[in-house]
Structures are given as C-alpha cells and as structure tokens.
C-alpha cells in the first residue's frame, strides 16, 4: 500500500510540471504606476474627493508672528502715529526726515501735543504713507506784524511750552493782528505738500486775546483749488487741560503753481513743505514685533511666505502676497491617481498591472514594469514616461502663483463717521471681491487637478500601448495591465521591451508555436489557473482514494495480505 501511495504522489508531481503556469517557455510582463499606502484627497471638476499619491497645499494659513525687516524697509512707529510724526509732535521728533517702505503703526501710539483733528485724516494718512518719506524743507514765509512760534503747556518740549515742530502758531503782536497775505511759488519739479491749520478757541475772550478780531478767517488757495475755514469758537471736551482745538488741513502745490495764504487771525501756518514722492510705500496697523528675517509679504499678523498662491491669514497685506481667500485649504494634485497596492496576490504570488492596483515602493519613477520569467521576478521604472508627466506637473504651481500673487498692497480703508455709507459700500465691494476670488480659486484648483489626473492616466495608457505595439502577436493582453509573453524571455529580453529595442520578429515563430500548444490546454476563464490547480488536486485525491479502496477490498477477499509489524 505504501508503495502505491508513493507512486501516486510521484505521478502527481510529475504531472504538475506540465501545467501551463510553470512553463519556462513563457513570461509575464506587467505595467503599473506608483502608489502610496495613504494618499491625499483632492477636489476635481467631476469628483469632490479623489485620492492622489501626492498633493501640495496652496493656502498659506499661518504667519511667522513677526514682521520681517528684509527686503522691505520697515519703520516702526512705536508710540507715534504717522500724522503725529508728520506734524512734529515733540515725542515723535526722532522720525524727522525718515524714509520707509512700510510704516507700522502700533495700537499703543498716542498724541502728546495740542489737541487736534484732521477733517480728511484717512486721505492725508494714505497720501503721506504712499510717499514713503518725511523729508521736510523749511521755507522763509514772511509773516509781518504778528508774533510767531506760539506754544502751549499741553505740548511740552523739554521743560518749555511747545508746539508742533512743522507748524508755526501766529498770534497778535501787541494789540494788533494785521491781515496776512503771503505767496510761495513752486519752482521745483515735484509736488509740494503743505500742512497748515486753524485754531478754534474755547471762548470769545480767548479769541480776542490771541487774535484781536472777534472772528477770524483763513483762506489757502492755488491755481487749482481754494479752501476757506472760519474758526468755530466754543468749548469742547477737555484734553490735556485744554478745551480748544486745532484743525489740520493740507494743500498740494504742483510744479509751476503758487500757494497763496490769506488770514486775519487763527492761522496755524506752515514752516515749509514735504517732498512728495511716487511709489508703493504704505502703512499698516500691527502689533507684531519686527524681526530679522526675509519675506516679500507682510500682514498685520506678521510676515508670510509667498510661495503659495493663496492665503487666509489677513485681508490686509503689503508686498508680493498670495491672494486672500476664505478657504482654509486648497490642495493641488502633484501626483497621479492613487490606487493602493493589494497586500495579497494569492498563494502563488501572481503579479498584477495598473488595471487592478498601483505599486508601492517605486521610489525611482512613477511608471514602470514588473516581470516574471525563468530567472525570477523583477521591477524597473520607466523614466521617460515619468519625466514626461513630471515636466507638465512641475510648472502648475508656478503658473497658479503667477496668476494670483498681487504685486501691490491691499491697505486698510478708513472713513470718517459722515462717510458711513461709503464705508458700508466699500466693505460690500471688498467682501464681494473676496467671495469671487474664493470661488475662482476653488474652480481653478479643481480644473488643474482634473487635468493632472487625466494627464497621468494618459501617460500610463501611452506606455501600455507602446508596449503592446512592440510585442504584437508574441504576447496576449491579460486584461489587468499585464502581457503573457509566449516565448522564453530572459531579463535581457525584458530589458529590450522596456527600452524600446525589442524585435518581435526574432521571437515570432517560437511565440506562435507556444501559443498554439498552450491554447490547447488553457481555459479561457480569468480563473483558469485556479480551476486547473483545484481540478488537479481533486484528481490526485480521488486517485489515492480509489487505490486505497481497491487495496482494502483486495485485503478483505484474501487476494492481498497485509502484515503490520510493531
């Protein structure tokens, strides 16, 4: 009995060597693409969530926490507002003739001189900020019959009463205040900015004590404009021990124009002019510290990198900055569609192509080949198709940045209370712009992602078709991204297929012969290997059972004697 069972087993092993799957005269070549265990979800035009092997975040959502001092020239206002520095508040004297790209105003800034207001504060602030300089030129105005350089205890300069250094407070000399009528031409090639003011006493007595006349008037004009201001005498809330005020005005004199000042009292006269420069300097309110670093883009929260096309840190920016959007995240696909590799390929270790899943561990390329032949198995990347895909994807991020980065600044808008409706309209317009940009950004990224996925799929298909054209009738498409090669194909042969030097005519006769032989015994089902192995195992089992049954029957009849020795 032992002999018969042993012979049956040997017979099965011998028979097994003739199964098609173990024939050394064939090989399997699969084409596939890179895959990762955990991909990144992105949005496309046709799919809200599709997994890709790699993606780049396009929204900058955090700042450095500090304002970088390079490459922009930052001027820290510290305790001074720009207007206080412009007027010459005593505690802002250190800002005289300073220059900046960005003037940073702090929340702790305060005025420490005569109480004042600026009827068009926002326009003056913006005008001076964009000029980027406090360069001041003194001029010799001829004020006759009046006392100059008035001061106040509310504006101490050291131990003495003082006033704004860029303004000249005129008041009566003796008991007279003659009418002042002075002119100052602009013979330069640039605009001149003159700052002047009107004093509003708190009482009629203060008015006559300073200017003699019960009511003064100030008129400042050029060829293009004229401003007339009549002082409003009356008490106001007390500030630094005073209930009177100074209103600040400004006039721009163009080259070739002339400044004319006429007044019979209450004039706060200019001492000279500020040079106006054209540029892209600006001002920003921020409490972020200024640090030693480099960043093109600055927000009130601090500097941010501008290597992304979008940001949601702050709407207010300066420099070359990403476009502000509402989204916290927008991911740009920089890899292909991700189909994680199946961890088990059956008990016989079969390989599969891109139709079934991707391949993990392809670190040297996105597309490649796996093969199974008489020399074993192997894998290699296809660098040409990989590079073709990478070249087209690499430029995407730069193109999106070029489309969206602002090469100018977005300043905060300020309006006085009487301009409330304008402010509401401005806010509505800004919000609408942000909504529109946010929608455009999402659409742009979805379109780019769709193109990337279609592109990488196309490169995979191109490589597959290229391989099919090389093999022709020497191989059969197995339907899963693999080819069954009907001739002996060693590693050198596989290499020739990969590099495009394969000559199908060399192997044509062998392939045709093997194809006809194998086709005679192969099943057409996609599960033919399984069916063959299962039927083979059942046949061997039944053969053993039949032989064992025959032996048992023969023993019972006495035809065979079985001795068991212990």
From Swiss-Prot:
Glycans are attached at residues 24, 38, 54, 79, 142, 181, 301, 499. Disulfide bonds join 30-482, 68-293, 80-92, 113-155, 297-321, 489-493. Residues 17-530 are extracellular. It is a single-pass type I membrane protein. A lipid is attached at residues 555, 562, 565 (S-palmitoyl cysteine). It is found in: Virion membrane; Host apical cell membrane. The keyword tRNA processing does not apply. Keywords: Clathrin- and caveolin-independent endocytosis of virus by host, Clathrin-mediated endocytosis of virus by host, Disulfide bond, Fusion of virus membrane with host endosomal membrane, Fusion of virus membrane with host membrane, Glycoprotein, Hemagglutinin, Host cell membrane, Host membrane, Host-virus interaction, Lipoprotein, Membrane, Palmitate, Signal, Transmembrane, Transmembrane helix, Viral attachment to host cell, Viral envelope protein, Viral penetration into host cytoplasm, Virion, Virus endocytosis by host, Virus entry into host cell. Pfam families: Hemagglutinin. The record marks 345-346 as: Cleavage. One of its GO terms (cellular component) is virion membrane. Palmitoylated. GO terms for biological process: clathrin-dependent endocytosis of virus by host cell; fusion of virus membrane with host endosome membrane; fusion of virus membrane with host plasma membrane; viral budding from plasma membrane; virion attachment to host cell. The keyword NAD does not apply. Residues 552-566 are cytoplasmic. The chain crosses the membrane at residues 531-551. Residues 1-16 form the signal peptide. GO terms for molecular function: host cell surface receptor binding. Binds to sialic acid-containing receptors on the cell surface, bringing about the attachment of the virus particle to the cell. This attachment induces virion internalization of about two third of the virus particles through clathrin-dependent endocytosis and about one third through a clathrin- and caveolin-independent pathway. Plays a major role in the determination of host range restriction and virulence. Class I viral fusion protein. Binds to sialic acid-containing receptors on the cell surface, bringing about the attachment of the virus particle to the cell. This attachment induces virion internalization either through clathrin-dependent endocytosis or through clathrin- and caveolin-independent pathway. Plays a major role in the determination of host range restriction and virulence. Class I viral fusion protein. Responsible for penetration of the virus into the cell cytoplasm by mediating the fusion of the membrane of the endocytosed virus particle with the endosomal membrane. Homotrimer of disulfide-linked HA1-HA2. Major glycoprotein, comprises over 80% of the envelope proteins present in virus particle. HAMAP family: INFV_HEMA. Belongs to the influenza viruses hemagglutinin family. This is Hemagglutinin.
């Amino acid at each position: 009995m032992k002999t018969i069972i042993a012979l049956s087993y040997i017979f099965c092993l011998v028979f097994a060597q003739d199964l098609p799957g173990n024939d050394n005269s064939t090989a399997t070549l699969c084409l596939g693409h890179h895959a990762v265990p955990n991909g990144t979800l992105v949005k496309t035009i046709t799919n809200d969530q599709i997994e890709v092997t790699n993606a780049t975040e396009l929204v900058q959502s955090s700042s450095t926490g500090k304002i970088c001092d390079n490459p922009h020239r930052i001027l820290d206002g510290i305790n001074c507002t720009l207007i206080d520095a412009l007027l010459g508040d005593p505690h802002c004297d250190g800002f005289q003739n300073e220059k900046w790209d960005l003037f940073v105003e702090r929340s702790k800034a305060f005025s420490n001189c005569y109480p004042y207001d600026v009827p068009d504060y926002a326009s003056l602030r913006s005008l001076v900020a964009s000029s980027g300089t406090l360069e001041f030129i003194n001029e010799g105005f001829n004020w006759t019959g009046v006392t100059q350089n008035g001061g106040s205890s509310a504006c101490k300069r050291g131990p003495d009463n003082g006033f704004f250094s860029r303004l000249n407070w005129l008041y009566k000399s003796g008991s007279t205040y003659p009418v002042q009528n002075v002119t100052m031409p602009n013979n330069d090639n640039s605009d001149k900015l003159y700052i002047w003011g009107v004093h509003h006493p708190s009482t009629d007595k203060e008015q006559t004590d300073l200017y003699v006349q019960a009511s003064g008037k100030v008129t400042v004009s050029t060829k293009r404009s004229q401003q007339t201001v009549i002082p409003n005498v009356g008490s106001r809330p007390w500030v630094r021990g005073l209930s009177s005020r100074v209103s600040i005005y400004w006039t721009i004199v163009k080259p070739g124009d002339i400044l004319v000042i006429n007044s019979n009292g209450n004039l706060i006269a200019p001492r000279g002019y500020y040079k106006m420069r054209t540029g892209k300097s600006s001002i920003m309110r921020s409490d972020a510290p200024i640090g030693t670093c480099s960043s093109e883009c600055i927000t009130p929260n601090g500097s941010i990198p501008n290597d992304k096309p979008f940001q949601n840190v702050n709407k207010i920016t300066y420099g070359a900055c990403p476009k502000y959007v509402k989204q916290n995240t927008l991911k740009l696909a920089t890899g292909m569609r991700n189909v994680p590799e199946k961890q088990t390929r059956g008990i016989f270790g079969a390989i599969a192509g891109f139709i079934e899943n991707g391949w993990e561990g392809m670190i040297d390329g996105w597309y490649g080949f796996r093969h199974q032949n008489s020399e074993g198995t192997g894998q290699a990347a296809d660098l040409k198709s990989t590079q073709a895909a990478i070249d087209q994807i690499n430029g995407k991020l730069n193109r999106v940045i070029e489309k969206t980065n602002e090469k100018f600044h977005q300043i905060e808008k300020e309006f006085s209370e009487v301009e409330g409706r304008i402010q509401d309209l401005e806010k509505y317009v800004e919000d609408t712009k942000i909504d529109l940009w946010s929608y455009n950004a999402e659409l742009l990224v979805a379109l780019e992602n769709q193109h990337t996925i279609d592109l990488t799929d196309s490169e995979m298909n191109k490589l597959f078709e290229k391989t099919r054209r090389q093999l022709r009738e020497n191989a059969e498409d197995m339907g899963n991204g693999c080819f069954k090669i009907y001739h002996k194909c060693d590693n050198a042969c596989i290499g020739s297929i990969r590099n495009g030097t394969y000559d199908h005519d060399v192997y044509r006769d062998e392939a045709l012969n093997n194809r006809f032989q194998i086709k005679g015994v192969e099943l057409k089902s996609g599960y033919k290997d399984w069916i063959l192995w299962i039927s083979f195992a059942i046949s061997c089992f039944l053969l053993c059972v039949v032989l064992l049954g025959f032996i048992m029957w023969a023993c019972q009849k006495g035809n065979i004697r079985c001795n068991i020795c212990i």
